[in-house]
Amino acid sequence: MTQHDRLLIIDFGSQVTQLIARRLRELNVYCEIHPYQNVTEAFLKGFAPKAVIFSGGPSSVFAEGAPMPPACVFEMGVPILGICYGQQVMMHCLGGKVERGHGTAEFGRAFVTPAEGRLAILDGWFEDGREQVWMSHGDHVSQIAPGFQVFGTSPNAPFAITADPARHFYAVQFHPEVHHTPKGAKLYENFVKLAGFKGDWTMGAYREEAIAKIRAQVGDQKVICGLSGGVDSSVAAVLIHEAIGDQLTCVFVDHGLLRLGEAEQVVTMFRDHYNMPLIHADESDLFLGALEGVSDPEVKRKTIGRLFIDVFQKHAADVGGATFLAQGTLYPDVIESVSFSGGPSVTIKSHHNVGGLPEKMGLKLVEPLRELFKDEVRALGRELGLPDSFIGRHPFPGPGLAIRCPGEITREKLEILRQADAVYIDQIRRHGLYDEIWQAFVALLPVRTVGVMGDGRTYDYACALRAVTSVDGMTADYYPFTHEFLGETATRIINEVQGINRVTYDITSKPPGTIEWE
């Protein structure tokens, strides 16, 4: 199996550390994020990075117990890039000086101008005399460490870009990973080129290596996979099936809360097209019965999550002799489980997942996607031959339409919601907008309104259209449809869907709102 060169990102707590990894993965460089407290001398020997990046972070080098890397990292003889707090750490550790931010803090857009000398990591920069960057710092470097030179300055950061070219140590006070630093990607490209990375970490290579790993892990044992019809579980299932064939059985739990025709699409694709052993468990009566009279969104989510585990266990037992459970865990999930802070956070919404299943069922985990980001999963899906129409689908929540139907759920409401959602998505596709939007759906509101159709009075439901743009789902903006589009869509829904006589458009961003209504 090919051994790829690895880049280590030491995380000091920045909110945008994952973006560093994303930028490097886009360059076909394999990298991992590890919190600073886990990076010991023994870890570094085992990981053997070809280069290291220090992330930014909210701390001050003056704080008691301030996050620091092990001293031996500077003796490894590999290129190091320090970003924001990472720059301050480098200067602090190597003999420079950092001062507290009194009137010199910079937050937001700034412009860096070049200093004397040429630096290979800045190839392609300063062609127009200065570069826009994104700053977010309180403290600042006041004296650079021995061996370092200044290669770029900003009004409040005289050492915005510094380097010790002989040791291949580079440090910047800004964040090259964010889109607000337009040439940040070029800086990363130059850094990995200087470090000697070949850019050989592709989805084609990942596919071959993942298949070999799955075969080595599973042997001749049986694997069960909870198939939701979403991108993650689908790509995991196709990859595992390619590795071990009919040793894999998928269990598709239909809770009666799916979109129009969705269950049939999943069964057709995986049973008929991919010829996978598939148990289609239609448990809609069980789920809808348990949700009868329930209006609290947290109770809805927890009821669905509990029943899902019960149903999955029951049908998985029918497989008999399974040793492994496959899950579509992604790299952001892994990062968060070993996060910088490890501290508790407020539960905004309970997540519907099968996290408790392995312990309950005594199964070992197969997680073939745990090294990938979402966009890489989609690329792997294309590599595996899944159709773009499936790979490019918008995210769909585990509890399904239950959380797009605020208030009590009934079969009648669900059918109205399915029909309205199908019309809305059809409109978006007809206008060529689907791929511009992160997520779009209809929420059926627990409100009836008076209307007039023909010569008669109506008293039907109102619905809300939702469409947002986002990069990762953590923040989102509403999509700016034209009034013509909204008017045309509202007319179609009211004319084609019996039970709705009023259509609204939700223009709330996240934050303060969430993408889903519940």
Curated annotation (Swiss-Prot):
Ligase listed as a keyword: yes
EC main group: ligase
Domain Glutamine amidotransferase type-1: residue ranges: 6-200
Keyword terms, alphabetized: ATP-binding, Glutamine amidotransferase, GMP biosynthesis, Ligase, Nucleotide-binding, Purine biosynthesis
UniProt cross-references to InterPro entries, sorted A to Z: Class_I_gatase-like, GATASE, GMP_synth_C, GMP_synth_GATase, GMP_synthase, GMPS_ATP_PPase_dom, NAD/GMP_synthase, Rossmann-like_a/b/a_fold
Reaction catalysed by this enzyme: XMP + L-glutamine + ATP + H2O = GMP + L-glutamate + AMP + diphosphate + 2 H(+)
GO cellular component terms given for this protein: cytosol
EC number: 6.3.5.2
Pfam families: GATase (PF00117), GMP_synt_C (PF00958), NAD_synthase (PF02540)
Domain of life the protein comes from: Bacteria
Residues covered by the GMPS ATP-PPase domain: 201-393
Binding-site list for ATP: 228-234
DNA-binding in keyword set: no
Sample GO molecular function, one term: ATP binding
Pathway: Purine metabolism; GMP biosynthesis; GMP from XMP (L-Gln route): step 1/1
Catalytic center residues: 84, 175, 177
Subunit structure and binding partners: Homodimer.
The protein's name in its UniProt record: GMP synthase [glutamine-hydrolyzing]
Source organism of the structure: Cereibacter sphaeroides (strain ATCC 17025 / ATH 2.4.3) (Rhodobacter sphaeroides)
Encoding gene per record: guaA
